[in-house]
Structure formats: C-alpha cells, structure tokens
Regions:
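Short functional micro-motifs and their immediate structural scaffolds
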Residues: 75, 118, 125
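Short pre-active-site segment immediately N-terminal to redox-active cysteine/selenocysteine motifs
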Residues: 64, 69, 112-116, 124
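Conserved C-terminal portion of the radical SAM core fold
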Residues: 152-154, 186, 207-213, 235-349
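Short cysteine/histidine-rich metal-coordination sites, predominantly Zn2+-binding motifs
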Residues: 82-95, 133-138
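Accessory C-terminal segments flanking Radical SAM cores
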Residues: 1-88, 104, 278, 290-349
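Leucine-rich repeat
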Residues: 58, 140-148, 171-178, 201-205, ...
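Distinct, well-ordered alpha-helical segments
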Residues: 165-173, 196-204, 266-270
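Core AdoMet radical
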Residues: 101-112, 123-137, 149-165, 177-195, ...
Length: 349
C-alpha cells in the first residue's frame, strides 16, 4: 500500500469548485470543507480557511479528506497512484504555495438539468430570472479574474452543460482571447443533448474539449428510465454514445456509475456496454469506467438512504454486491472506491 504522507495531492492547490452559494477545493464529498468567505472566487481560493485545508495535505494527515469517498486516496490502498499526486519535496511544496490562483475551475453554479436523477435532485431544475443572473455574474467573474491563469475548465459538476442556457452559450461563444493558458475543457454530462448538430456550433471549444465524463448509472432500459435517469430515454442515450465515443478530439473518457441498490447488479453489463463502444472506435483513446458509492446530497431521508447503501456490510444485499464487485474490480480500465471492503470481506474479494 502506498503511503499517502509521502505524496501531495495537488487538487486543493490548483482546483476550485464554484457553486452558487459555496466554494470548494475538491469534490465536496471527498473534501467536505466549504471555503466560501464572501471574498470572491479568487479571494476565497487564497483565504486563510483554504490554507488551513492545504496544510492537512502537506502534513500528510489528509485529515479533512474522506478516504472512503475519494477514489484517488482509495486507489492508494491498491498501490495505484493518480497523476494528481506529486512526491513531497521542498521544491514541490514551494511550487504549490506560489500558485497565483486555480489551474482548474469547476462550473457548479448552475443546477439546470433536463433530468431529475433521484441521487441528485427531487425534481427538474431550470435556472431562470435571478438565478440565471447569478450564473452570468459568476461567469463574468471567472472570465475577468481567473481566465489569465486557468488551464482547465470543468463543465459541470452540478448541471448538464448542454442543457444550461448560460453554459451552452459559454461553450458556443468561448472568449478564447481571455483564456491564453487554457489547455483542457472537461465536459461532465448525461450525454442526452450532446448531438452532432450542437457540437458543430461549439467549434471554439473543440481543441480544448479533450476529455469528458458521462454519467449513466445503468445498463438496461428499465433501470435507466425508472431508477437512475428520470426523464431519460434509453434509445436516445445509446444513439448519442455512438456519436460521442467517436469524436476524434476527445482523448480521455470516463463513464461513471453511482453504485446503489437499484443498479449494482448491472455493474458488469455496464462495463461491457461501455467497452463495446470503444471496440468500435476508429482512433485510439483512453477510457475508464468509474464505480462510485452513492452519496446522499439531501435527496433521501436516513431510512431511505440506508436502503441505497448496498456496499454497507449491514445491508441485506451486501454479499450479493460483493459478488458483483468481484466481477469488475480487476477488469482493465476500472476505477472504484470500494477498496476498504477488501479488509471487511477479505475471504470473498
């Protein structure tokens, strides 16, 4: 097992996730410390509270991080290390402390989406009026204050970027002249609106949009339309994937799968579904399937969420989940955050 104290996770030094009312230095479920101080995006990033979080990385404790949720810390137990980690040296510490601002900004300040996925929201959401004005205000702040040193944009950790009016317009009319250091635009989407016609209108981002994450969470029509992607159409997403997985400028794909009681039996089939698309791809690319634990973002009461946590050893279907996990955990291109279960069920895994 790799010792985390020998390495520095660079995310809290180079990444910020901006929500409409809060701000983070990593995925909120992986590093649950809100750094919003009313200082603006850049000011919050350099605030005393943000620096306190970074010190827990530098001292090797990672005490603010949730090691069960973070797939990158979880992978260390499997002797796998992500590129986000660098060796802890005086030179690297000095380098990280001198960063003028975030390299990566995650646009999570618009929750508009054409789906009402139960793990994410209780109903369909479309930002209008004052809500959209706030989105436009934050976009302006990013364009004017952060653009000069931003290398990566992430759209979006909270909405579907192709559905959000503000994000869609941003991608169509990207102010390239402001983002002189931009190298990558990562698209996180349910994929349903990512059509060739719309993509052709977004030519300004094509050279930057070289990675994406598609969240589908199902391998069957019933589960997709009735359990994990309310508002979705199975035939539509399969058709969209035929196009999306063949885009030559996309060099890295991630297919995420929020694992829960309603879909864990489809883990292996999900992997096969994804692999089949890349078996047909004309040009080589990198792809992965990421199995994550379901997280309660406030959409479940305590009793309901206990039923969702099939990976909890007290869950009546825990052993069945372990059997399904065994089928995929060693497959090529699979990433997951269930490594702690090896110690719980070592005889089965």
């Amino acid at each position: 097992m790799i010792n985390k104290s020998d390495y520095i996770c660079t995310a809290p030094f180079r990444y910020t996730e901006v929500h409409d009312k809060d701000q983070w230095l990593c995925c909120p479920s992986w590093l649950p410390v809100d750094i919003e101080q009313g200082l603006g995006i850049k000011g919050n990033f350099r605030s005393e509270k943000a620096e306190e979080v970074r010190e827990t990385i530098l001292d090797g404790s990672y005490s603010k991080c949730d090691e069960l949720q973070c797939p990158y810390l979880a992978e260390l137990k499997n002797n796998k290390i992500s590129a986000r980690f660098i060796t802890k040296t005086d030179k690297n510490i000095k380098l990280l402390r001198s960063e003028p601002g975030p390299h990566t900004v995650n646009f999570a300040f618009d929750r508009s989406c054409n789906y009402a996925c139960p793990t994410c929201r209780l109903d369909f959401i479309m930002y209008k009026g004052e809500d959209r004005k706030l989105v436009e205000k934050k976009l302006k702040e990013v364009n004017e204050e952060l653009a000069p040193f931003v290398k990566r944009l992430y759209l979006s950790g909270s909405a579907d970027p192709f559905f959000s009016n503000s994000f869609r317009k941003f991608m169509i009319d990207l102010p390239v002249d402001k983002y002189k250091k931009l190298e990558n635009m990562h698209l996180h989407t349910n994929g349903s609106l990512w059509t060739k016609e719309l993509w052709d209108r977004m030519k300004s981002i094509h050279k930057f949009a070289n990675s994406c994450e598609l969240s589908i969470d199902a391998a069957t029509k019933h589960t997709y339309e009735n359990e994990t992607r309310i508002g979705g159409n199975w035939e539509t997403i399969l058709e969209r994937l035929e196009f999306i997985t063949q885009i030559p400028t996309i060099k890295r794909y991630c297919f995420s799968f929020v694992t829960q009681d309603t879909n864990f039996e489809e883990m292996e089939d999900y992997y096969k579904l994804v692999k089949a698309y890349f078996d047909k791809r004309k040009t080589p690319t990198k792809w992965e399937v990421k199995f994550n634990r379901v997280i309660n973002w406030g959409t479940y009461d305590k009793e309901s969420f206990i039923k969702k946590e099939v990976f909890n050893k007290q869950h009546p279907q825990f052993n069945e989940f372990i059997e399904e996990l065994n089928k995929v955990k060693e497959l090529p291109n699979v990433v997951h955050n269930f490594h702690d279960l090896y110690e719980v069920k070592n005889t089965l895994i």
